[in-house]
C-alpha cells in the first residue's frame, strides 16, 4: 500500500502533533474514536484529543481512499476552527463519504502564521447503510420492550453483529444504561422483514468479563452490560449499530452503519 501526502511543510511555531482518540469497543459505555454515526445524516466520525496550545488557528482534516494501484491519495476535506461555535474542535463527522468504501483520515494542527504540525496517526473506517428503526417509539407500557428494526444491507456487506444502546434522558450525563451485543441470526430478512429482539436485564457491570446471562437472554447474545432490572417509568432513547466487518486480532468493528436515536417513554 502506497500513501501519498502533500509537500513538506513549515512548522515554525512548533505546533503539536494531534493525537487521535483510540477506538472503543462497540459495546463500551462511551463511544470513542473513529466510528459510524448518525446526526441528521449518516457519516464517519473521527475524534482527537483537545489541546490548549497557543497559536493554533484550526485543524486541517485529510481524507484518502485506495486507488486502483493500491495508493492512498490524501486531500484536505475541511478545516475545523477553534472559534467555530457550530463545530466541536475535537470531533468531526464526515457525511460526504460513499457507502462500502474504505476511507483513511489524518489531521494536522495549523498555526496562525500558517505553520503546520506533523500528521496525526492515520485511522480508517467503512460506512454501511443505517438500520431502519421501527419500535419502541413514543409511549409504551412495557418494562421489557421489544426492539424492532429493518436491517438495511447490501450484498457482500451483510450485518454480522448488532449492538443496541439505551440511554436514560432523565440523567444529566446521558451515559448508556444498557448495552447488548449479539450475533445476526436473521440472514435472509435484510431490507424487507422486521427483526425483533426483546430487552432482558443485564447480569454484569460495565467492563466486567461476562459469560453468564439472564435466563431470558436469547442464545445469540455476545455481551450485555448495565441495567439489572426492568425499565422503570421514564424517558429513554435507543439506537442500533449493525456491524459487517470486525478485526479478528483486536475485535474492533471496521465497517458498520448506525441508526439515528429514537425516543420513547415508559408509563405503566
Stretch-by-stretch model annotation:
Residues 7-55, 99, 114-156, 251-268:
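Pro/Thr/Ser/Gly-rich low-complexity, intrinsically disordered linker/stalk tracts
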Residues 92-116, 228-250:
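Beta-strand-rich modules
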Residues 2-4:
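C-terminal motif of bacterial Sec signal peptides marking the signal peptidase cleavage site
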Residues 53, 66, 112, 154, ...:
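Short coil/turn motifs at secondary-structure junctions
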Residues 6-9, 41, 70, 159, ...:
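Intrinsically disordered, phosphorylation-rich cytoplasmic tails of plasma-membrane receptors
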Residues 22-27, 37, 42, 48, ...:
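Membrane-topology and secretion signals of cell-surface/extracellular proteins
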Residues 50, 58-98, 161-231:
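Recognizes extended acidic, P/S/T-rich segments that occur
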Amino acid at each position: 500500500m502506497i500513501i501519498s501526502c502533500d509537500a513538506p511543510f513549515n512548522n515554525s511555531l512548533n505546533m503539536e502533533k494531534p493525537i487521535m482518540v483510540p477506538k472503543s469497543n462497540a459495546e463500551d459505555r462511551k463511544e470513542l474514536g473513529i466510528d459510524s454515526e448518525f446526526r441528521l445524516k449518516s457519516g464517519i466520525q473521527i475524534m482527537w484529543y483537545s489541546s490548549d496550545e497557543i497559536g493554533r488557528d484550526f485543524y486541517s482534516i485529510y481524507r484518502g481512499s485506495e486507488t486502483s494501484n493500491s495508493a492512498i491519495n490524501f486531500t484536505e476535506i475541511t478545516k475545523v476552527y477553534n472559534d467555530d461555535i457550530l463545530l466541536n474542535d475535537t470531533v468531526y463527522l464526515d457525511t460526504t463519504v460513499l457507502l462500502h468504501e474504505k476511507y483513511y483520515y489524518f489531521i494536522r494542527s495549523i498555526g496562525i502564521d500558517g505553520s503546520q504540525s506533523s500528521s496525526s496517526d492515520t485511522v480508517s473506517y467503512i460506512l454501511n447503510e443505517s438500520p431502519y428503526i421501527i419500535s419502541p417509539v413514543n409511549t409504551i407500557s412495557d418494562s421489557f420492550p421489544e426492539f424492532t428494526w429493518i436491517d438495511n444491507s447490501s450484498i457482500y456487506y451483510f450485518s454480522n453483529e448488532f449492538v443496541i444502546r439505551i440511554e436514560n434522558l432523565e440523567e444529566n450525563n446521558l451515559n448508556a444504561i444498557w448495552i447488548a451485543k449479539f450475533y445476526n441470526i436473521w440472514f435472509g430478512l435484510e431490507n424487507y422483514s422486521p427483526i425483533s429482539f426483546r430487552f432482558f436485564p443485564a447480569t454484569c457491570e460495565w467492563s466486567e468479563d461476562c459469560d453468564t446471562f439472564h435466563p431470558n437472554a436469547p442464545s445469540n447474545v455476545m455481551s450485555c452490560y448495565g441495567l439489572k432490572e426492568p425499565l422503570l417509568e421514564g424517558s429513554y432513547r435507543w439506537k442500533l449499530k449493525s456491524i459487517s466487518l470486525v478485526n479478528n486480532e483486536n475485535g474492533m468493528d471496521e465497517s458498520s452503519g448506525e441508526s439515528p436515536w429514537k425516543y420513547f417513554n415508559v408509563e405503566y
